[in-house]
Amino acid sequence: MSNQALLETLNQTTELLSVKLAELAKLASMETNEDTEDCQLSVVTNGLMMVNNQTLQLVRGVQDLILLTRNIREKWLLTQIPEQLTPKEQDSINHEELTELLESCVSEIISDV
């Protein structure tokens, strides 16, 4: 997936989450003016079902957002890998320093998740 496609999907997912959260807040504050108990029970039941549905969609959106951010991080990390060096250049590499750098990058990424 290209960077532009990932960012577009990220924007769509955040917009969807915003809409679902607004709908969830609207459903949570829904009141009825009916006096009959059966009607109120029906409205409350329908309201709870709608809240459950909106919450489920919100959770799915957050899961999609987590997956997208992981893909973006992986893509960024893979683009940071340098080109393959010649044997002379490989001898001059400090492997201990590279190991420490890799461990610090991995720990930083893991701590963000």
Swiss-Prot record:
Sample GO molecular function, one term: transcription coregulator activity
Alphabetized InterPro entries for the sequence: Med22 (IPR009332), Med22_Saccharomyce (IPR016530)
GO BP, one annotated term: positive regulation of transcription elongation by RNA polymerase II
Broad class of the protein's primary localization: nucleus
Keywords from the named record: Activator, Nucleus, Transcription, Transcription regulation
Cellular compartment(s): Nucleus
N-terminal signal peptide: none
Pfam families in the cross-refs: Med22 (PF06179)
Protein family per UniProt: Belongs to the Mediator complex subunit 22 family.
Subunit structure: Component of the Mediator complex.
Job description of the protein: Component of the Mediator complex, a coactivator involved in the regulated transcription of nearly all RNA polymerase II-dependent genes. Mediator functions as a bridge to convey information from gene-specific regulatory proteins to the basal RNA polymerase II transcription machinery. Mediator is recruited to promoters by direct interactions with regulatory proteins and serves as a scaffold for the assembly of a functional preinitiation complex with RNA polymerase II and the general transcription factors.
UniProt protein name: Mediator of RNA polymerase II transcription subunit 22
Organism of this sequence: Candida glabrata (strain ATCC 2001 / BCRC 20586 / JCM 3761 / NBRC 0622 / NRRL Y-65 / CBS 138) (Yeast)
